[in-house]
């Protein structure tokens, strides 16, 4: 996403192409990319917890188990994972690390969360289902040896209690790097809902601070789709130095081809085409995140 200077019109989420009528819809591509990336983060954390807890714990007490500390020959950090049962079917966990060459250094928590397991009809826990929250702290990780380029924090909540249940994922990213502008730190909010066999939605808000060449602004995207794949995105953009709200709406069919697009502030026919009556959702709906 980028914020143009005062001579430009809008804050935009960038995609690789500018869709034309009949081509793959630009805002479908944005919706898919954002949802796959953010949802993938939640799935990756869940998979990591399950992977580690599949191994025998190093130590076990009545309500907690500890894996580690363990070291790898090429990893300068030694890691420890603690899982604590806080209530029936409810667990808290934390991933901690420290410099493996400093055995008296305190452990630093880089990932922590809580999880309530989904239960089947017999009251037994189902792997891969549940509700909870977690925080991934890249700033904390940066205090340990060999940090990566990530900074800031990600706070997730999720709910998928069983097969056939609604999936909800929310995320807040605070002071993370913008891939397009590595020197910028930005905030973003995200919400995803998928009803089983039915409609789904994604909301994404991106806040960009001002700098020497940009006044900054806020972009909001709300996308909705049918189970067939046909959908619609409605976008609003407010740049700090512009007195107007910039809007974009685009619809796509079940083949993800763009069928309708409107950009009220543009007179370019490439930005305005098709009939809104063909949309899976006939009226715009803007994000309220």
Question: Which residues does each PLM region occupy?
Answer:
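Short N-terminal edge-element motif at the start of the domain
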Residues: 47-146
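Acidic, low-complexity intrinsically disordered regions
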Residues: 23, 63, 75, 134, ...
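N-terminal "mature head" segments of proteins
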Residues: 1-89, 259-289
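Short helix-loop boundary/capping segments
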Residues: 108-226
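Acidic surface patches and DE-rich sequence motifs
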Residues: 71-72, 86, 99-102, 177-178, ...
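Polar low-complexity intrinsically disordered regions enriched in Ser/Thr and small residues
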Residues: 71, 75, 116, 200-203, ...
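Hydrophilic extracytoplasmic domains
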Residues: 223-289
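A residue-identity detector for tryptophan
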Residues: 27, 67-70, 79, 138, ...
